[in-house]
């Protein structure tokens, strides 16, 4: 492939989104639309990407700087916005001036890299190549006008099209590959003599024909690849179509999804970590589960309904029961050991590390804590900044008090400890191996191995106790 530069159109206001967030920063699968398009440029190994900004540039340009990730990206402003041709005019001075220029739309997120490579190849370096698609309802799109010989003669925008032209179902996707050496000359000849009073980039097609430059249309069948976003409804429809495509790809690998229409795989919106789900054999995922960031499910893992799992590695044979939240952060993420049972209604926060056959039950929260093989916290408990040994049984209603108002402190619970119900372990504290903490105790000092520790008020019982009577209402 010859030298390739990319222009990304990202100046539009997106009025129909009815949002103060610029359209190109609206999220699809957890990633801004423009982030998907920058990925396309990166996948093409573009020499340079020039992003044309305008509306919301103060928000869009910092995002571009964060998302560049090794790509040579330049931003140019289009002020005022006078059409697509005018936008490309602003970008030309930032190009290298040779090779091929491919024009992408910042709100068309799902074009495949191999499709774009095929478009560039169709242009052959010296031709103008258009990416087109046939739509059952082409309203709003520019129509591809062909001559009697089938050759492309031009593109007519929907608002300027005649009734006969509006009947054409082959449309221009907004993506083209242009010989860099010809682009500036064509742009200089653009006029705004049209219904919109704008400078249309599509007018260069007729100029190419007039100049004897071949125009080729690379037509694809998959309309999803060139679908743009102009409204919340379109964004939601594209999200569902994209998620269904991801679900089908997983099922083709052998993953068992209870309902592929109720599955989501997203980027981690907090950190930008790309959504990736790797599954071993015989993995089962129930309905309405959301995966974000990097998640790995080992062989035979079962995920119950309505779980949210981010940045986690779940080892073979583990079961995550319904309504569980696993909220890891890279690089380490949350670790769940082989054969572990988690949930329902459990929460594993960053730094949670569960060993083999650990049980974390309903309404148990674990943060920045490790639990060794066979440890159990089955009911209504909190473990924060704790190291829990093998075979520990941690009772219902018990918590580690890890924060003194300024600093966090660790609790160590050694192997074979039994912690009764409704206990408070005030860190820093160590419960020695084989020890027992009596129910209802507040432990503030470390205890030796094998000891029974009880720290609670003495019970007082008053027989024949009379409860206070309610006062009469005034």
Swiss-Prot record:
Residues 254-474 are annotated as: N-acetyltransferase. Residues 1-232 are annotated as: Pyrophosphorylase. Binds 1 Mg(2+) ion per subunit. Keywords: Acyltransferase, Cell shape, Cell wall biogenesis/degradation, Cytoplasm, Magnesium, Metal-binding, Multifunctional enzyme, Nucleotidyltransferase, Peptidoglycan synthesis, Repeat, Transferase. GO terms for biological process: cell morphogenesis; cell wall organization; lipid A biosynthetic process; peptidoglycan biosynthetic process; regulation of cell shape; UDP-N-acetylglucosamine biosynthetic process. Its EC number is 2.7.7.23, 2.3.1.157. Acetyl-CoA binds at residues 396, 402-403, 421, 439, 456. It is found in: Cytoplasm. Residues 233-253 are annotated as: Linker. UDP-N-acetyl-alpha-D-glucosamine binds at residues 23, 78, 83-84, 105-107, 142, 157, 230, 349, 367, 382, 393. Its main location: cytoplasm. It catalyses: alpha-D-glucosamine 1-phosphate + acetyl-CoA = N-acetyl-alpha-D-glucosamine 1-phosphate + CoA + H(+); N-acetyl-alpha-D-glucosamine 1-phosphate + UTP + H(+) = UDP-N-acetyl-alpha-D-glucosamine + diphosphate. The keyword Transferase applies. It comes from the Bacteria. It is an enzyme of class 2 (transferase). Gene3D superfamilies: Hexapeptide repeat proteins, Spore Coat Polysaccharide Biosynthesis Protein SpsA, Chain A. Pathway: Nucleotide-sugar biosynthesis; UDP-N-acetyl-alpha-D-glucosamine biosynthesis; N-acetyl-alpha-D-glucosamine 1-phosphate from alpha-D-glucosamine 6-phosphate (route II): step 2/2; Nucleotide-sugar biosynthesis; UDP-N-acetyl-alpha-D-glucosamine biosynthesis; UDP-N-acetyl-alpha-D-glucosamine from N-acetyl-alpha-D-glucosamine 1-phosphate: step 1/1; Bacterial outer membrane biogenesis; LPS lipid A biosynthesis. GO terms for molecular function: glucosamine-1-phosphate N-acetyltransferase activity; magnesium ion binding; UDP-N-acetylglucosamine diphosphorylase activity. The active site is at residue 379. One of its GO terms (cellular component) is cytoplasm. PANTHER family: BIFUNCTIONAL PROTEIN GLMU (PTHR43584:SF3), NUCLEOTIDYL TRANSFERASE (PTHR43584). Homotrimer. Catalyzes the last two sequential reactions in the de novo biosynthetic pathway for UDP-N-acetylglucosamine (UDP-GlcNAc). The C-terminal domain catalyzes the transfer of acetyl group from acetyl coenzyme A to glucosamine-1-phosphate (GlcN-1-P) to produce N-acetylglucosamine-1-phosphate (GlcNAc-1-P), which is converted into UDP-GlcNAc by the transfer of uridine 5-monophosphate (from uridine 5-triphosphate), a reaction catalyzed by the N-terminal domain. This is Bifunctional protein GlmU.
